[in-house]
């Protein structure tokens, strides 16, 4: 009986940790997304926001967990140059470029 209670307690503890981590990840991603969107919009002011957002999504989808944390931290600290640098690194990768190409076609064909 004690073993069953121990397993149930462990399961509940791990479930709570996973849920907390999911919330933290979502908050970091949202902060990073806002930072990337702001950086791209400021670097390309003539591009409508609707066209910048798909690029931002591609950057966030292809950034590593460490890059998401760095982008989020840089955003909070107001380090726009760091956000631009990290965004450029992620944009230079082939999977991100493929994502951006698809997003561009979608944005142009489905305004």
Report residues per predicted region.
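Post-signal-peptide N-terminal segment of Sec-exported extracytoplasmic proteins
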Residues: 33-71
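Compact alpha-helical subdomains of small soluble proteins
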Residues: 55-111
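Hydrophobic, lipid-facing residues on alpha-helical transmembrane segments of integral membrane proteins
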Residues: 9, 31-32
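Bacterial signal peptide processing site
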Residues: 18-21
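Sec-dependent signal peptide recognition
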Residues: 2-10
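C-terminal motif of bacterial Sec signal peptides marking the signal peptidase cleavage site
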Residues: 13-16
């Amino acid at each position: 009986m004690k073993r069953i209670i121990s397993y149930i307690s462990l399961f509940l503890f791990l479930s709570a940790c996973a849920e907390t981590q999911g919330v933290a990840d979502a908050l970091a991603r949202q902060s990073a997304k806002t930072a990337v969107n702001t950086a791209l919009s400021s670097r390309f002011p003539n591009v409508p926001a609707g066209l910048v957002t798909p690029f931002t999504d591609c950057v966030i989808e292809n950034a590593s967990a460490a890059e998401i944390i760095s982008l989020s931290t840089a955003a909070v600290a107001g380090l726009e140059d760091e956000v631009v640098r990290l965004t450029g690194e992620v944009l230079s990768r082939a999977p991100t470029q493929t994502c951006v190409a698809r997003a561009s076609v979608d944005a142009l064909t489905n305004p």
